């Protein structure tokens, strides 16, 4: 099993799909990494040679991924909260940040619906 950026990539998947298991690498970024490393997208993770793994690791090391990226995102959110911006307040209260309506929906962000006591006839 190939281990890149601290993540074990699934052996049976194509390398372009396997790279997307790393936080911060999507499909487009995975394709660019493989193009720069000179590795075919169709090769399976289990079929990678050690030389190809090293080339991919070198490319991934140039990108901010996993822990560093998670830390940066959390610091950005914390900064928004500290300066008291509208977006920071929405993060603090657990509401949608990007202008979505919340009258009926937004259950994912607001959590499970809580019944109001005394609402019966």
Swiss-Prot record:
HAMAP family reported for this sequence: Ribosomal_uS13 (MF_01315)
Superkingdom of this protein's organism:
Bacteria
Gene Ontology MF terms in the entry: rRNA binding; structural constituent of ribosome; tRNA binding
Name the species this protein comes from: Limosilactobacillus fermentum (strain NBRC 3956 / LMG 18251)
Gene name tied to this protein: rpsM
- Cite the entry's keywords alphabetically: Ribonucleoprotein, Ribosomal protein, RNA-binding, rRNA-binding, tRNA-binding
Q: Which PANTHER family match?
A: 30S RIBOSOMAL PROTEIN S13/40S RIBOSOMAL PROTEIN S18 (PTHR10871), SMALL RIBOSOMAL SUBUNIT PROTEIN US13M (PTHR10871:SF1)
Q: Which family does it belong to?
A: Belongs to the universal ribosomal protein uS13 family.
What does the subunit comment say?
Part of the 30S ribosomal subunit. Forms a loose heterodimer with protein S19. Forms two bridges to the 50S subunit in the 70S ribosome.
- NCBIfam families (alphabetical): uS13_bact
GO biological process terms, semicolon-separated: translation
Q: Where is this region: Disordered?
A: 90-121
Question: What protein does this entry describe?
Answer: Small ribosomal subunit protein uS13
Q: What does this protein do?
A: Located at the top of the head of the 30S subunit, it contacts several helices of the 16S rRNA. In the 70S ribosome it contacts the 23S rRNA (bridge B1a) and protein L5 of the 50S subunit (bridge B1b), connecting the 2 subunits; these bridges are implicated in subunit movement. Contacts the tRNAs in the A and P-sites.
Q: Which is one Gene Ontology cellular component term of this protein?
A: cytosol
Family matches, as Pfam families: Ribosomal_S13
This protein's record includes keyword Ribonucleoprotein? yes
